[in-house]
Each structure stands twice: as structure tokens, then as C-alpha cells.
């Protein structure tokens, strides 16, 4: 029984382990920011500042709206080691996480805003009969947040902000499980929800000179507790050995601390840079609890390193009607290679982006951008995962990439 249950728990552990570090995290909360490689902490000059750096809201005037969506098309492949070198790929799907922001300047010193976004919102789907079916078939996560933010201008040079984050989420993960000595595989599924979790954020914007700005943004941990049901379809003789019934899994996302700088090197050219620190080492245990006392609750250690993202961006004002943006970023994966799992394969990533802004009228700005993300090829030779419990390590080579297209509409009153 322990091995059969263990395979299911491994899926829970690695689902939690890689969702935030890997491709499930969505940083694209406005088309303009995406075009600039996400180097927006010291720019934050539209309503999406609610997410990137709330202190930037004091730069705005009147009432500002920003809505948009991003089409994300991720692809992952796995190829085993000799002699099993067949290449398997995830199902090709397009996802549309969206964002909406509204901000208002109440006085010279006070601004506020509220926004909706999807910080996680993708899934991976492998063929139900692929070689890694005992590790992962479907992994799906959707997390939504609503965040009100208040900003205060302390002086002509310095602004600060504070915000609350209300979040809810849905998760579904499936795999197969061997049911020796009976033929075929058991099918295991877990689906759960977290209906109410909270976090907070702070921002700071310092402009010692009209051409130069510094930004700091802090996003707290958010503690999720997924409550759901595990369902197993398999041989009735093994029903007591495979997980079923109510289950909870706790997950805490790490802090994010970002430092940014932006400088107008020319009257029409702005360059920006961000350093984003992700505090993974603060989360050391994943807890999985079963309502059925015949299954032992699990407390699984986390073997993670802190990580970081380096972002560079630029914007050029081509004319009164058009602006061009470009960016690049490097995202360091905190997951050790031996713990990479096909539920969410990932590695160090490079992102290359570009976009255009079109002022359709005095009040309306349309931004369109494109981002290509390429994960470095990752060959695992010492995997802690196994084809089946007690079998050969799940060694092989992962490749992942994604194409993203985003559009945002900004309107000011």
C-alpha cells in the first residue's frame, strides 16, 4: 500500500514544488510591461502599476483603466535515455489569462486602484498511455487575485504604496498507477479548490531626477489550502490501497522582492532594469492530509534554492502616435535537476520580447506585444523520480518553450 500511495503523493509534492518556479507562473499583467521584458518596477506609469509597483500610481492623473489578455501557447517534450529514446510531447493548447486594472488620482498626494489578474493559469497534458503516465498526465492550476492598492506621495521625489491581495484557486492533477497483479492501470485524479487566501504588497518609487527613477516592490507569501477529493478508478481488490475521498494539500508561495531602475538616456528613449528575488528557501515542507485515517498524512521536505530573475527593457517614442518596446530576461530555476518532474517540466529560461503602442486617440492607447520563452535543454541523469515505484529512475531530456501574444487597452479620463 505504501508504494501505491507514495506515487500519488509524489505527484502532489512535485505539483507544488514546480508550479511557482516553472511555466505556471504568469508575469504578464500588461502588454506594455511584457514587451519590456517585465522590467517595469521603476517605470510603472499605467494602471498595471497596481501589480508591478503601486507607488507608481502617483504618476497618473485622473482615472485610468487598463484591460487585456495574453494568449500563451506552451510546449514541452521528454526523450528518454538509450534504448528508450522515443520523444513525447504535451498536448498543444492556448490559454488566455487576463488582467483588468482601474486607478484614480484623488489628490496631489493620494492615488488608489484595484485590479484583477491571473498569476497562475496554465496546464500540462500528456498522453494517458505515455511512458511517464505513473508520474503525470494532467496538471492544471488556475489562481485568481483581486488587489486593492493605496499610494501616497511623501514628496516630489518619493512615493509609497500598500495593498491587500485576495486570492482563490482551483487545481486538478491526474496520473495512472500500476495495479499488479491485476491487468491495466488504475486512474487517479485529484481536484480541489481554495476559496479564500490573502496576501499583501508594498511599493516604493523614488525619482531624484525627472530622468531617473528607482522602484522597489514586495509581494508577500500567500498560503493556500486546497480542499478536494481524490478519486481512483481501478481493480476493486485494491480499493483500500489507493487514495480516495477527501484530501487537503497546503501550499505557500514564496516572497518576491524586486528592485528596479529606469533612465531616460535620450529624450525619446527610456531604458529599464529589474532584479527580482524569489525566496524559495523559506518554504521547506509540503503537507498533504487525508480525511481517511487509513492513509498516513504526509509532510514532505522541500529541497529548494532561492532564485532570481534579471530583466532588461527599453521603450522608444517613435512619434506622437507610436511607441516601440523591447526586452529580455533570464529566469533561474530553483529546482534541482534530479527533482524535475514531467507534471511541470522546467529549467533556466530566457525570454525575448517586443511590442508596439498605438495612441488611437488622446485618451486611448493600444499595446500589442510578443514574448518568446525558451527553457534551456535539461538532461536528468540522477532522477529521484521513477517510472514505477522501485523501478528505473525517470532519466531523460526535457525541452520546453512558449509563445505569448498580449494585447492591452488603456483609457484615461
Regions found by a protein language model. Give the residues of each.
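Glycine-rich nucleotide phosphate-binding loop and flanking beta-alpha elements
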Residues: 58, 73, 120
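Short strand-turn segments of transmembrane beta-barrel domains in outer membranes
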Residues: 38-41, 64-74
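Sec/Tat signal peptide C-region and signal peptidase I cleavage site
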Residues: 15-21
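Outer-membrane beta-barrel pore proteins
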Residues: 41-45, 50-63, 102-106, 154
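Cleavable N-terminal signal peptides
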Residues: 8-9, 19
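Bacterial N-terminal signal peptides that target proteins for export
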Residues: 1-7
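Outer-membrane beta-barrel porins/channels
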Residues: 22-37, 62, 78-88, 94-413
